[in-house]
């Protein structure tokens, strides 16, 4: 996954995203799917500046949360945010190279991060998530998805991506989240050209996860489906 853009935006990331109440609601919805006990471990894939981590550390007071991200600047901000917290750990990694031993985690979570995985590496990413989860460990993954598969110049896919991104951007304009609106509009050419942004269908990720050993897969629908957000929940099959 490319890191240059996220290294550049790291300092302003929270300022851009914090006014987006929809983004904050998705974080809460992910958290509602995580039910931990004492000593359990959660992995946050693509932790960024630590917004989902912060929510989980608050709502899962007996759990340990490990965040990984490919961007060094994001990691520095996240590590500073949780400095001195013995239940938080931050390191460099991505969906294809998590950097932990096998069967270490009870939960793996991710929010708007895995669409940065190169299309040809999606199967490897699904396998890596399965590797680090314990048997019966749970994945909770939220992202933006297209309804139409296809290449960079596929008209149906292009239209679907543009409609979703513009709808979400206009929603942020209505919220007064002006910088988030601009950020979303600036990403449209990258999504269209498949340049560091590789939004795909829910069904494609479900197929990769099933092949990697996940079962009890379900798609959790969230408000404003026109934005493309869905939450995928799955359980790693027992040994």
Write out the residue ranges for each language-model feature.
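Core SAM-dependent methyltransferase catalytic element
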Residues: 212-239
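Conserved class I S-adenosyl-L-methionine
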Residues: 1-36, 51-55, 189
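A short SAM/SAH-binding and catalytic strip from SAM-dependent methyltransferases
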Residues: 107-121
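C-terminal alpha-helical "lid/dimerization" subdomain adjacent to the S-adenosyl-L-methionine
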Residues: 142-210
